[in-house]
């Protein structure tokens, strides 16, 4: 496959600071807390793509104001509610905030500043990454139609993160435990015929390796893939596009 006839659309959004209030807290797995925010400031909120990221702005107990990137997991325009899923890293300030979050607590959101809208009518969709990619993968699978063909490869060593995906697309799901197993699983895929889109997100060095596998071994067209580093070992608040 050397080309694609489908077109990814990039759109920009006007950025607003939105003051919101915590109205719900859930823990879908041992390593994630889902926090639902509400507020009139969400009336004109827009998230056009499953892998959008917004800035979550919060204060630490010491009074330091921090910003972290999060995927808009679920948005209800009628109720004006927005849910974010926080990964519970051992010493992360955003994780610490989520652990102590309570109804009525205030926070500020900004963005998304733009969306990369990937058509849903590709012949197949590959979604691959580590646990950090799970909120985006869950959202994409919920949005794909029943006719879509989805292949999912996720790296997480914790079985509690291996939640069932709610999707009309009935995806082919493969769970692995280590970065090397993630690379090997994607390398070993027999990708379907037709035009497909490969979306991958996770730790920076692993995603660089995964991108190389897609380009050199699967001959995936560069215009039909998106690879993002959601985090990097030893670096806080990291996000980088790794597209070829």
Predicted feature locations:
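Extended, composition-driven regions rather than compact fold-specific motifs
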Residues: 1-244
């Amino acid at each position: 496959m050397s080309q694609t006839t489908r077109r990814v659309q990039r759109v920009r959004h006007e950025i607003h600071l939105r003051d919101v209030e915590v109205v719900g807290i859930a823990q879908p797995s041992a390593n994630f807390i889902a926090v639902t925010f509400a507020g009139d400031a969400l009336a004109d909120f827009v998230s056009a793509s499953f892998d959008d990221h917004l800035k979550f702005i919060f204060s630490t107990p010491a009074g330091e104001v921090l910003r972290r990137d999060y995927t808009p997991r679920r948005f209800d325009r009628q109720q004006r509610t927005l849910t974010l899923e926080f990964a519970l890293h051992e010493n992360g300030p955003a994780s610490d905030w989520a652990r102590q979050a309570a109804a009525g607590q205030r926070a500020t959101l900004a963005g998304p500043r733009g969306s990369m809208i990937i058509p849903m009518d590709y012949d197949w969709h590959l979604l691959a990454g580590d646990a950090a990619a799970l909120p985006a993968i869950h959202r994409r699978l919920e949005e794909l139609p029943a006719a879509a063909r989805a292949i999912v490869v996720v790296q997480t060593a914790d079985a509690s993160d291996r939640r069932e995906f709610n999707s009309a697309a009935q995806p082919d799901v493969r769970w692995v435990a280590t970065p090397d197993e993630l690379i090997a699983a994607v390398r070993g895929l027999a990708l379907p015929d037709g035009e497909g889109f490969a979306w991958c997100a996770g730790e920076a060095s692993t995603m660089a390796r995964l991108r190389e596998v897609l380009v050199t071994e699967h001959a995936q067209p560069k215009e039909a893939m998106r690879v993002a580093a959601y985090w990097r070992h030893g670096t806080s608040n990291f996000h980088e596009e790794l597209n070829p």
